[in-house]
């Protein structure tokens, strides 16, 4: 005798779970006040700027609202010279203004336009990238870091326009300000130790070569 595996109730539960999963993808990124770090990619949408340049205000004010697609788990389009627009909505459910930094953790992107938008109006913007002066970066850092102000009980939209000649990958993360600088200090210490050890190895090998005249050193 064969047992019934999936009755109407089971099918209904399965459909509900699938709907929840779909709704979760591309939804607003809700700020977690105690979280030091939040991943952004799964809440990000994109569209490709084909042909003539899109006017930023047209994109921001919904002139191309039908062209947005969901990114997925990571933003990586390989080697392409196509310009991509990215959009993420950051929701602050608390009654306090929250300060965050949005990091693009890939320092080889040529051109990045950043727009912080509330109620359809551009509140802040920046133009930076690997092909721009280091002083163009909102924060002096090896990656691209943008301060973001999240108003109480409100939604802030972030738009990025990215163009590059190399690998088009845009790893995004939202950090608490103090947590970002703490992680950065640890990263600097780790890199300093690595390069310090590398320098010691080079010096020792150079000294041994001068003493022993062995090419293997």
Where are these regions (language model features)?
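Bacterial N-terminal signal peptides that target proteins for export
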Residues: 2-12
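Detector for methionine-enriched segments
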Residues: 1, 18-19, 32, 193, ...
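Soluble non-transmembrane domains of integral membrane proteins
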Residues: 24-190
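Bacterial N-terminal signal peptides
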Residues: 13-22
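Core alpha-helical transmembrane segments of integral membrane proteins
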Residues: 182-217
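Proteins with a high burden of low-complexity, intrinsically disordered sequence enriched in S/T/G/P/A and R
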Residues: 6-8, 23-25, 208-216
